[in-house]
């Protein structure tokens, strides 16, 4: 329109002039994201984060297992950081349900809430059967445990279990190889007991998760 009305200077020149005169439109800055304060747990079992890790294929050395996929199911109590892991050959709602059964037996206190992502091994939220509970959710209900799913595409909301998986890559998978599923399951169990639940942590006042649980049980 300016050209049609006889404007002959360059558009960049006009822009510089308007900016110099201070008459450019001012766009307000985008509001700064302020994360919500993290909800602290008051007792063990109040909320436990659960997630699944795919075992790196580079760790599988035996020709009989090369090309197969193993999975590490992980649960972390938010209060004590106590962790329970188990090896599985399949990644589905049945494996998730069996993991919950074993977790309930292993954890020394009642579990109030389980928090997961929106994977189909946990929920039908993003499937064609969204109104139908998964076998995993059925087992949770049988034990009186509520199921909380995090916001989609925000793994930081399950941050404790996500960080533990990154540590697993550094401490375990980077240095270990597995020649069968049974070998993987055995090594994973030993690693978790030795290098995690008995390992002192700064957020726990340099106590181990096992010690925090022990102290809590002694106080009730």
Feature locations, PLM:
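Short small-residue beta-strand/loop micro-motif enriched in glycine and branched aliphatics
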Residues: 82-86, 148-150, 174
